[in-house]
Amino acid sequence: MSEWTPEEAYAAFKKHEARFSDFDIESNEAQTRLELIDTVLFDILDWEKGQVEVEKHCREPGYADYVFIVGSRFPLVVEAKRAGKNFFVKPNSISSDRPVPFSLLAKESPDAKSALVQAIMYATTLGTQFAGITNGLQWLFTLTFVEGQTIDDR
């Protein structure tokens, strides 16, 4: 991944903005990955495709959609879902200056709960510090482990 500023990423997003607003949320996961998620990762955030392994086998849990590689480490796993999966949390449930705890997210969005559990299982299997989920339109990230905290507190 090359260095970029938030302004450069925003300018890159603006070039692709119509793709996001016009996307059919009933599309399947593969189409969501091709048209939205890959656009964010490779065209907007400028990750190199050689730094991302797709469908990486993670022993028993299954296959991680995106595993990011930096040197010999895997710093991030991202689990993809189709655009129609909603990770919605009611605006009055959250504070703008604090992260959303997993327990609130799980209560408000079963789709987000199931995707985060899946991503955390993959990340834990690979020894990855961060896990994320996306439907191409919403992106959520968490630490896979924080000493002294349960998953509900993260």
Give, region by region, the residue ranges found by the protein language model.
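A short, conserved, highly charged catalytic patch centered on acidic carboxylates
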Residues: 1-130, 138-154
